[in-house]
């Protein structure tokens, strides 16, 4: 299997499977002198890990990360300092139940990558989906923790803005609420609605889709590139690579098709300190593939997981027609735990473009 690496200067390679002994990543291209602690990396992994509420998979993984290379300890015994060599991180799997998947060893789950992996490689890891499992994304979150440290002043946040047909009220948006509920919802009023709705989905053994919004603040104006190396192009690619993602938009995205040029264009004025000021941010912080200095805003849509208890029609690898129902432990809405994953992938794209701009223009420190 190829294509396990993304990025240009800030390059991330992930490895491992859902039911293997461990998984992890290698971050290559991180500049020397980047300071971070194991606790900081662990905090982001804790945000993504399973089993934290009844609304996510009950697989119990502590997701304890180990840093194996690419750093030296500071005198305080806690702070790690990057050396400029590859940073390797590992997370052990401890709660696999491969027997739960024995019934689908030859059967293709409708809506899952079972068939396409078999079509491409002639073999597939049916135990939890192997590399196609969202378990792989734990390694991306670890890499994203490093990426956040590369760009000075960068703040990346995410929130769940829609589950099924139930959307947040954007006038209630409060970042302080995101970590106060099991959905990473910025609107406290939507929480009881989602709780009741997802309880019904969960008890029925079904699943539902969602929309996640990620925002990066402190992105330097000018990073990115035109035409074939656009910042938004790479952000979209990173987000699209996340399991179950079926659509990505930047700024007002598809809503731009419904408004006029007068409404869509972000007008400008000169600020109190002589700096350029935008009067809106329909562009989502990117114009012509290059950052404007405004917050970078992206959203991505996530399909319902195909691992459900309802029987669905399918075929098996012997060419027989079968009915498939998936046992095991699964998220009724994978969009919840996709929030920190989206944050990590956005951070990695921005860190990569920051280093590329610094190498090309020399204007960034």
Curated annotation (Swiss-Prot):
Report the superkingdom from the record. Bacteria
Residues that bind NADP(+), according to the entry? 48, 54
**Pathway membership:** Metabolic intermediate biosynthesis; chorismate biosynthesis; chorismate from D-erythrose 4-phosphate and phosphoenolpyruvate: step 7/7
Stored InterPro entries: Chorismate_synth, Chorismate_synth_AroC_sf, Chorismate_synthase_CS
Question: Could you give the cofactor binding note from the entry?
Answer: Reduced FMN (FMNH(2)).
Its recorded reaction(s) are: 5-O-(1-carboxyvinyl)-3-phosphoshikimate = chorismate + phosphate
What EC identifiers does the entry list? 4.2.3.5
Q: At which positions is FMN bound? A: 131-133, 243-244, 288, 303-307, 329
Q: Signal peptide position in this chain?
A: none
Q: What would you give as a GO molecular function for this chain, any one? A: chorismate synthase activity
Q: Which cellular components does GO assign to this protein?
A: cytosol
- Output the GO biological process annotations, alphabetical, semicolon-separated: amino acid biosynthetic process; aromatic amino acid family biosynthetic process; chorismate biosynthetic process
Cofactor(s) listed: FMNH2
Keywords recorded for this protein, A-Z: Amino-acid biosynthesis, Aromatic amino acid biosynthesis, FAD, Flavoprotein, FMN, Lyase, NADP
Top enzyme class: lyase
**Family membership noted in the UniProt record:** Belongs to the chorismate synthase family.
Q: What does this protein do?
A: This reaction introduces a second double bond into the aromatic ring system.
According to the record's subunit comment, the protein's assembly and interactions are:
Homotetramer.
**Mind telling me what this protein is named?**
Chorismate synthase
